Amino acid sequence: TPDNGLEAIKQFDGSYLEHFETFGEKVASRNYLAQSIETFQKAAREGYMIAMTVGLSEMNTADGERNLHKTDEIRKGLGANEDYNKRLNYLLSLFLVCAEKHSYFLAHDGYHAHKNNKVWMTRPAEFDRPLGPPKGPAVQDGYIYTREFAHAKVRVDIDNQVGEIEWIEPEKN
């Protein structure tokens, strides 16, 4: 839709986001992703609840035709020794440049409890770090977004799919 669903969300208290990085059968172009970020930001600033869920593993493009309603099932799944921290930092940074008071985030390796699911019933250490309130909205410079919080500086480059979070330790009294 021309407004990316902002008019439709008025009928609800919020929205559940998945397919955030995909468009049709392909990984979203940087322009489409930038537009999605802008829409998320607008809805979140207007007070809508936004729940964003994203997959940690790569898209499995070797499967040919995919069922676009099953994006979780078309991911490769994390390998036994695969380090997913780089991807988690990217996804969490992407979320943080958009998030407001009623925004929620889940990064997963599928919605199953198989023994090969590396993140089932785990909690990333980043979730326990103090973030604090945002110092303002994200600043966009091309395809790079930055945002500061009381205890973190976030930078995400959607063109290169790189996210960085610099954690700032709170001062002790």
Question: What is the predicted role of each segment?
Answer:
Residues 1-173:
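Glycan-processing catalytic domains of CAZymes
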